């Protein structure tokens, strides 16, 4: 901005704000204590530095000049922050004039802006760093933040709107909200959307943009919770990759690594694309080893299913790398296979996943010599192949001859073990059948003895006909009791006798 005094007596001014011309006279001094002081001390040139430091747009300065001349001005969420700042630094307050711009701006802020969530966010999201600095100096940043925090705690879904704010406002807002018992789902969603908007966008190559992105990814790591499963594994891997690319601090990178290792079993093979080859065709093997080491050394011992999930994921990643990367070198494939085998050892019953990856790799690299093929198959454990995989491998012409011979040997061993198990089963079934025959013989012998015993009872009790089953009440006895054939004395007896009754004939 350029200021030109027309003459020392009139003190009329010609101002240029970012190339836009403004003509002012002493009317401005009547509304601004600062300008009055500068005029009296003949230091009007300092006004240029005041306005430049606030990065005032010509439209805002035009609004101020209109107020100084007594015209009506239109305040809005778009201009209220800048108007507040310029009114404060030009000392357009009650101390200088009863009808002042600062009082008018503060009233509008309280009644029209802070009462509305959307208007408050809108007022802040368009502020430059210089304006925010001035706003912080006068203590108005806290006023805006307190208003937003109060509303966000009542409805955490509003956190999605905050991603439009500058980082210096967004981070303290999320940190303060996270101290309360709020929905982690909405909080995490807001942080992830912020990263997608400000960090993961394609870099234009500008140094300042890269610096802002680096600060952004470091803030994202600080804001994300550590609870297992609250953040998708895909986002964590993507954030880790971006933190490495942007050269973020070690604490930032370590934070993402820890979160990934805590829920590695929830990741998918495609999430491991962070290991995708760089320009030189190499994979970040050490990073993968670091994450796996952290996962397996976790103090909270996971159940076996988590180990199984990680082992299968690594096998699937190895398969995808073999299928999609035509430039995958033998040495790199071998290192990835070694990691996958180490993860599946004593966890998976079969190593069919490793075999499938090797088969695909050999298919895509037909030009490999025999020694290179053997190198690719170095960590293939033929003894852990399923019978189906052995059958396929025994006919696989892509495999080295030595591997095929090992597979054939394993197949023979599997057949022998199968026959042995079947023979053992036959012997066990035969023994069971013998036991059943002996049991049946004992039952038949018992049945042969029972008739003699029953005959003896019939001889002793000629008058009683007993038809009974073992451990069951005589049906005939029940019939007699119901029809009054049993006296109290005969009820106590172990068997009852049928008393002969006289037959009476009635003659008419």
Swiss-Prot record:
**Record's comment describing the protein's domains:** The BTB/POZ domain mediates the interaction with some component of ubiquitin ligase complexes.
Q: Which residues form the BTB domain?
A: 11-77
Its name, as the record gives it, is BTB/POZ domain-containing protein At3g03510
Q: Which Pfam families match?
A: BTB (PF00651), NPH3 (PF03000)
Residue numbers carrying Phosphotyrosine: 355
Role: May act as a substrate-specific adapter of an E3 ubiquitin-protein ligase complex (CUL3-RBX1-BTB) which mediates the ubiquitination and subsequent proteasomal degradation of target proteins.
Limits of the NPH3 domain:
156-414
Q: Which organism is it from?
A: Arabidopsis thaliana
Q: In which pathway does it act?
A: Protein modification; protein ubiquitination
Keyword set, alphabetical order = Phosphoprotein, Ubl conjugation pathway
InterPro entries linked to this entry: BTB/POZ_dom (IPR000210), NPH3/RPT2-like (IPR043454), NPH3_dom (IPR027356), SKP1/BTB/POZ_sf (IPR011333)
Query: Which family does this protein fall into?
Result: Belongs to the NPH3 family.
Any GO BP annotation = protein ubiquitination
């Amino acid at each position: 901005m350029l200021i030109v005094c027309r003459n020392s007596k009139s003190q009329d001014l010609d101002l240029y704000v970012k190339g836009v011309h403004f003509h002012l006279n002493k009317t401005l001094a009547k509304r601004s204590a600062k300008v009055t002081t500068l005029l009296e001390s003949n230091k009007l040139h300092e006004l240029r530095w005041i306005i430049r430091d606030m990065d005032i747009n010509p439209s805002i300065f035009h609004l101020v000049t209109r107020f100084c001349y007594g015209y009506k001005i239109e305040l809005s969420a778009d201009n209220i922050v800048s108007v507040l700042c310029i009114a404060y630094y030009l000392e357009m307050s009650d101390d200088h004039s009863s009808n002042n711009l600062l009082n008018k701006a503060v009233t509008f802020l309280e009644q029209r802006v802070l009462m509305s969530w959307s208007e408050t966010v809108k007022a802040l999201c368009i502020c430059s760093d210089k304006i925010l600095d001035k706003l912080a100096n006068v203590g108005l940043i806290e006023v805006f933040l307190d208003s937003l925090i109060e509303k966000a705690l009542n409805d955490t879904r509003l956190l999605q709107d905050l991603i439009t704010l500058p980082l210096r406002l967004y981070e303290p807002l999320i940190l303060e909200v996270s101290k309360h018992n709020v929905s982690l789902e909405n909080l995490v969603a807001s942080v992830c959307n912020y990263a997608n908007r400000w960090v993961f966008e394609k870099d234009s190559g500008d140094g300042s943009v890269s610096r802002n992105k680096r600060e952004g990814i470091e803030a994202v790591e600080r804001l994300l919770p550590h609870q297992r499963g609250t953040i998708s594994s895909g986002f964590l891997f993507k954030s880790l990759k971006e933190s490495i690319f942007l050269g973020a601090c070690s604490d930032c990178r370590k934070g993402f690594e820890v979160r990934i290792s805590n829920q590695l079993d929830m990741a998918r093979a495609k999430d491991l694309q962070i290991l995708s080859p760089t320009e030189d065709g190499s994979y970040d093997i050490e990073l993968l080893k670091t994450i796996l080491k952290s996962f397996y050394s976790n103090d909270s011992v996971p159940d076996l299913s988590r180990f199984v999930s990680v082992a299968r994921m690594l096998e699937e990643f190895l398969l995808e790398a073999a299928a999609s990367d035509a430039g995958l070198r033998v040495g790199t494939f071998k290192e990835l296979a070694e990691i996958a085998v180490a993860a599946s050892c004593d966890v998976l019953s079969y190593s069919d996943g490793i075999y499938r990856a090797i088969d695909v790799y050999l298919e895509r690299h037909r030009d490999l010599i025999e020694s290179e093929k053997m190198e690719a198959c170095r960590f293939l454990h033929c003894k852990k192949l399923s019978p189906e995989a052995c059958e396929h491998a025994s006919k696989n012409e892509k495999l080295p001859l030595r591997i095929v011979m090992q597979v054939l040997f394993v197949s023979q061993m599997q057949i022998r073990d199968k026959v042995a198990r079947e023979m053992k089963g036959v012997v066990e079934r035969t023994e069971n059948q013998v036991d059943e025959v002996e049991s049946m013989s004992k039952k038949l012998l018992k049945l042969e003895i029972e008739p003699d015993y029953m005959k003896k009872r019939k001889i002793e009790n000629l008058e009683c006909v007993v038809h009974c089953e073992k451990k069951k009440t005589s049906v005939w006895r029940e019939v007699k009791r119901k029809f009054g054939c049993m006296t109290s004395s005969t009820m106590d007896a172990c068997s009852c006798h049928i008393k002969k009754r006289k037959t009476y004939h009635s003659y008419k």
